[in-house]
Curated annotation (Swiss-Prot):
GO cellular component: cytosolic small ribosomal subunit
PANTHER family (UniProt xref): 30S RIBOSOMAL PROTEIN S18 (PTHR13479), SMALL RIBOSOMAL SUBUNIT PROTEIN BS18A (PTHR13479:SF62)
SUPFAM superfamilies: Ribosomal protein S18
Key words of the record: Ribonucleoprotein, Ribosomal protein, RNA-binding, rRNA-binding
UniProt record similarity statement: Belongs to the bacterial ribosomal protein bS18 family.
MF GO annotations: small ribosomal subunit rRNA binding; structural constituent of ribosome
Organism whose genome encodes this protein: Streptomyces coelicolor (strain ATCC BAA-471 / A3(2) / M145)
GO BP annotations listed: translation
HAMAP family listed in its UniProt record: Ribosomal_bS18
Record protein name field: Small ribosomal subunit protein bS18A
Quaternary structure and partners: Part of the 30S ribosomal subunit. Forms a tight heterodimer with protein bS6.
UniProt KW RNA-binding keyword: yes
Summary of the function given for this chain in its UniProt record: Binds as a heterodimer with protein bS6 to the central domain of the 16S rRNA, where it helps stabilize the platform of the 30S subunit.
Amino acid sequence: MAKPPVRKPKKKVCAFCKDKVTYVDYKDTNMLRKFISDRGKIRARRVTGNCTQHQRDVATAVKNSREMALLPYTSTAR
């Protein structure tokens, strides 16, 4: 039997580029929580759809936010 053709998933659009955001603020924890998994890990670019530069900015902002105790390093869920 022949396999059906494989469809490529649609490329996700960077939310920051779409909204023309120039600065990712580490104090905006509601926005940063979208880029953190339930275990507290920073989600990958292929999952979030961010471009390279904004993914770097998000990672830096999350790390700064953790350092300032605005976001947890790990989750309490087990």
